[in-house]
Swiss-Prot record:
A single GO cellular-component term on record: extracellular space
Single GO biological process annotation from the record: negative regulation of apoptotic process
The protein's role, per its UniProt record: Brain peptide responsible for activation of prothoracic glands to produce ecdysone in insects.
Keywords (A to Z) from UniProt: Cleavage on pair of basic residues, Disulfide bond, Hormone, Secreted, Signal
SUBUNIT field: Heterodimer of a B chain and an A chain linked by two disulfide bonds.
Transmembrane regions listed in the UniProt entry: none
Signal peptide boundaries: 1-20
Protein name (record): Bombyxin B-9
Database matches in PANTHER family: INSULIN-LIKE GROWTH FACTOR I
Gene field: BBXB9
More about this protein: Silk worm has two kinds of PTTH: 4K-PTTH and 22K-PTTH; there are many forms of 4K-PTTH.
Length: 90
């Protein structure tokens, strides 16, 4: 009886953990909010003044890309954090 209860609890905990990981909601990020979330995702900090990130943002902004950019993927339509992470260090 005890083994059955422990197995049941274990199955419930594992299924709750798995379902919470799968339910990341795609959101839209535009303007300052997009800049802040990118700074947080890429550098692990909240962006305040932005001066310390100027070279990064200028380089990213000035680089011409033929494929869709972060604004296309995360402002014009919802995206998940994994998509934002793919723009770190670009």
């Amino acid at each position: 009886m005890m083994k059955t209860a422990v197995m049941f609890i274990l199955v419930v905990v594992i299924s709750l953990t798995y379902s919470s990981e799968e339910q990341e909601v795609a959101r839209t990020y535009c303007g300052r909010h997009l800049a802040n979330i990118l700074a947080y995702v890429c550098f692990g900090v909240e962006k305040r003044g932005g001066a310390q990130y100027a070279p990064y943002w200028q380089e990213t902004y000035l680089r011409s890309r033929k494929e869709p950019g972060v604004v296309d993927e995360c402002c014009f339509r919802p995206c998940k954090l994994e998509v934002l992470k793919s723009y770190c260090g670009v």
